[in-house]
Design a protein with these regions (language model features):
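Class II aminoacyl-tRNA synthetase catalytic cores and aaRS-like
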Residues: 1-521, 525-526, 531-542, 564-566, ...
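Short Gly/aromatic-enriched secondary-structure transition segments
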Residues: 78, 555-560
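An active-site-proximal beta-strand-loop segment
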Residues: 547-548
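Conserved RecA-like helicase motor-core motifs
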Residues: 569-570
Length: 637
């Protein structure tokens, strides 16, 4: 007998399916001993070439996603990787025994059908079954046909079900594959060589980010997961591989939101004997090529906004962009103190360690970045934020660097690469000073990389592309998780830590409250009638993404799954109490039927519930978080 699920409350549907499997085994038809299929054509090939296949014998195989019919005639929809086709089966053709087994097939079963191609009286291209075989038994039912799988958290966790139930999801990942293939073809045709470099590194340099830490037992050495591809690729330029690129995963121990995932796909390339101007030309041509090849057009639409990759991309310096959108001319600011003063005047937050160049970058992020909708190269960054880049000869306070923007997002980052080992050592020293001041994203000195530069690196241009953001734009996907097959998710049993695995973060000590020092607001004297109260719609929601709202010190923007299949946006002024990344994956309570309220130009649709009290004169706030087993959309009574 097949071992059935032991948990209490197992559905009758699952029980019946296990019983069907037992019956198949007893009849000598165990589907799980079958190792192959005679499939010789895909369903879409038949449908796209009907005249060629009409009345011809074919063998198709795939998943059964619908069945209908009565008595001695059955119709079924069979799906394979290319699409679906209707199966027509008759008792008279298959015989009593085979037709009897076919009638016991369930939605989700994987089957093989041999027969001939024809059109029904309704004009639907179909396969008239002559032989049928069950290849694999589905023991758990798929989500109900018309509602499908809409719970966003569950879609990400069970992507295999998501791909079955939501064809548009599969289309997204087919396009992603084509995008990456198109990038490779373009670069290969331009004479670039694809390489692979280490993921486990002793020194995680090449970017400003917090790395993941691990320990290599065999060498008894602490290592890090790479945060960039840069430094090893530059070593290859030194070695004479003049045009190299890598497409690979990098890892940054940072927050999760609609555009960030801790592991993501990066493409970096380096080309000897060119500079950042050459990288601009390459970027423009590459984006145009990929869009045309994958989408058939150089005009793309994202979230209703049209962007034209066919026109020459705009080029603007960071200084000019800040002046244009903030009114502040940093050419007229000559000291760090002046920069801090104007930042205070404009309400731009900064840290005391920040210098003029850092503050210029903060101004760009605050005032200009959101306006970079059409393809735009923002050039000539301050040296303070560009430790691996060549200085501009005419103004050494700035470097030959650009960031490529679309839709207000940074899509790529490129340099005229620094190849002066003496200058590079000084930059590393400056980074180590920042590290000593508490900047855990600063780099340490990489002596082997300096040794490579001392051997001699030719003038080089380099660029890094975020593949995931590129896929978001070209597939019109709302969140980075929608273009990652298996995005990073908080484990459902994350509280059950395996023994012997060290935590990378200090255990949280539960805060003890002296309730004698707590003050709460008095209860209301006025009553609300039950009818009025019952009109408030309290729902459980899952936090898909959370990020700080630009230009606001208090607001967090939540992207929520409320069970409807459409993301809900709510803004809440709780940044003083929570960091965005710690709320992703939580289950919260909201009132959903409040009218939208515009906050910082964003419609907030509902209100998060929280508990507030005062303790020794300081306000404390706790969001109402509930058990993650409660599904999105569950109503509170």
């Amino acid at each position: 007998m097949s071992q059935k699920p032991q948990q209490t409350g197992t559905s009758d549907v699952i029980k019946v399916r296990y019983e069907k499997l037992d019956a198949l085994k007893e009849a000598g038809r165990d589907p799980f001993v079958i190792t192959t299929s005679a499939r010789d054509v895909l369903t879409e090939t038949i449908k796209n070439n009907f005249e060629e296949y009409e009345n011809k014998d074919v063998c198709v195989a795939g998943r059964l996603l619908s069945k209908r019919g009565k008595g001695k005639v059955s119709f079924m929809d069979l799906w394979d990787r290319s699409g679906k086709i209707q199966i027509f089966a008759k008792f008279d053709d298959l015989g009593e025994e085979e037709y009897g087994f076919l009638k016991k097939w369930d939605i989700g079963d994987i089957v093989e059908v041999k027969g001939f191609v024809f059109k029904t009286q309704m004009g639907e291209i179909s396969v008239h079954a002559k032989e049928v075989k069950l290849l694999s038994k589905s023991l758990k039912p798929l989500p109900e046909k018309y509602h499908g799988l809409t719970n966003t958290d569950l879609r990400y966790r069970q992507r295999y079900v998501d791909l079955i139930m939501n064809p548009e999801v599969k289309d997204t990942f087919v396009k992603r594959s084509k995008i990456i293939s198109s990038i490779r073809r373009y670069l290969d045709n331009q004479g670039f060589m694809e390489v692979e470099t280490p993921m486990l590194v002793a020194n995680a340099g090449g970017a400003s980010a917090r790395p993941f830490l691990t320990h290599f037992n065999a060498l008894d050495e602490d290592l890090k997961l790479r945060i960039s591809l840069e430094l090893y690729l530059k070593r290859l330029i030194v070695g004479g591989l003049e045009k190299v690129y890598e497409i690979g995963r990098v890892f940054r121990n940072e927050g999760v939101d609609t555009r960030h995932n801790p592991e993501f796909t990066l493409m970096e390339l380096y080309q000897a004997y060119t500079d950042y101007n050459g990288m601009m030309d390459l970027t423009e041509n590459l984006y145009r090529h990929v869009a045309q090849e994958v989408l058939g057009t150089t005009t793309i639409t994202y979230n209703g906004i049209e962007m034209d990759l066919g026109k020459p991309f705009e080029r603007i310096t960071m200084l000019d962009a800040v002046k244009k959108y903030s009114g502040v001319d940093f050419n007229e600011i000559h000291s760090d103190e002046e920069a801090k003063a104007i930042a205070k005047e404009k309400g731009v937050e900064f840290e005391e360690r920040h210098k003029k160049g850092d503050i210029l970058n903060l101004f760009f992020e605050e005032f200009a970045e959101e306006h970079m909708i059409q393809p735009t190269f923002v050039m000539d960054h301050p040296i303070e934020i560009s430790p691996l880049t060549k200085k501009k000869p005419e103004n050494p306070d700035y470097v030959e660097r650009f960031e490529f923007f679309m839709n207000g997002w940074e899509m790529a980052n490129a340099y005229s690469e620094l190849n002066d080992p003496i200058d590079q050592r000084e930059r590393f020293k400056a980074q180590e000073a920042l590290l000593a001041q508490g900047d855990d994203e600063a780099n340490t000195t990489d002596e082997d990389f300096l040794n490579a530069l001392e051997i001699g690196m030719p003038p080089t241009g380099g660029i890094g592309f975020g593949i995931d953001r590129m896929c978001m734009l070209l597939t019109d996907s709302a969140a980075i998780r929608d273009v990652l097959l298996f995005p990073t998710m908080k484990s459902l049993d994350s509280d059950k830590k395996p023994s012997g695995i060290p935590k990378t973060k200090d255990a949280v000590v539960e805060e003890k409250i002296d309730f004698s020092k707590v003050k709460v607001e008095p209860l209301f004297d006025e009553y609300v009638d039950f009818e009025t109260f019952s009109k408030s719609d309290f729902r459980a929601v899952k936090v898909k993404a959370c990020e700080a709202v630009k230009k606001s010190k208090k607001l967090l923007q939540f992207t929520l799954d409320d069970g409807t299949g459409t993301d809900r946006t709510i803004l809440s002024g709780i940044h003083a109490y929570y960091e965005p990344e710690e709320l992703v994956g939580k289950t919260l309570i909201v009132i959903t039927n409040l009218p939208p309220r515009a906050m910082m130009g964003i419609d907030s649709c509902g209100m998060l519930l929280s508990a507030v009290h005062e303790e020794e004169g300081e306000e404390k706030l706790h969001l109402l978080m509930v058990d993650n087993h409660i599904p999105a959309g569950a109503k509170l009574y």
